[in-house]
Amino acid sequence: SGEVIEFSVRENNYLGKGLGVDTAISLSSESIEGKFNVTNPNYNNTDKSISFGLQALETDKLTNFGYKSKKIGGSVGTKFEYLEDFSLGISTSLFVENIETDSTASERQKKQKGNYFDNFLNLELDYDKRDQKFQTSEGFRSFYGTNIPLISDSNTFTNLFTFTRYNKFLDKNVFKSSFYFKSSNSITGENIKLSERITIPSKRLRGFEYGKVGPK
């Protein structure tokens, strides 16, 4: 099953200090993930946001793919409006990970069994021309993000680009179109880790069964 159950608690003015706190737990048939993030949207009245996050993720794909992964880490970063409607985000993240395999795993997968440490520099470019963030009716949003390996065994370089356009038609109707592209490659020619392989988010697929090829 591809069903995901999520519990989350969000607070936009924690302790009356304007801090944003976001805690979430996600459960699926193959994974459990916990996230905790704290954001100061206007650090020292500089119009720059400062954020800190922790993440723990366990992915169990022993049944279908012969491996299991446990990953824990955190990040710290800042985001600010560099030009009108154009925001720049810079952060760094650290993760430790353990990958286990069983007898059903391929020889290539078995070679990836072990412990890993990764440190990334993360960049985000966000150009937002929507008329409003919620219940958008017109405009577009273009987003590009990249994770650059600083210390890593596989040296995986990840790119993400999304583009979404909103057009109003027939009075109260809104047509939404979007483009999604993501890639992961090792800049040193290594095999990327099993946990870093790209999958299309289930919310972007319709009529497909999770973990399989083709429509239901």
Pin down the residues of each PLM region.
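Short glycine-rich beta-strand segments
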Residues: 57, 145-151, 182-184
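Gram-negative/organellar outer-membrane beta-barrel architecture
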Residues: 1-143, 156, 167, 173-175, ...
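Acidic, glycine-rich flexible loop/linker segments
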Residues: 152-158
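Short, solvent-exposed, mixed-charge loop/turn linkers that connect secondary-structure elements
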Residues: 185-190
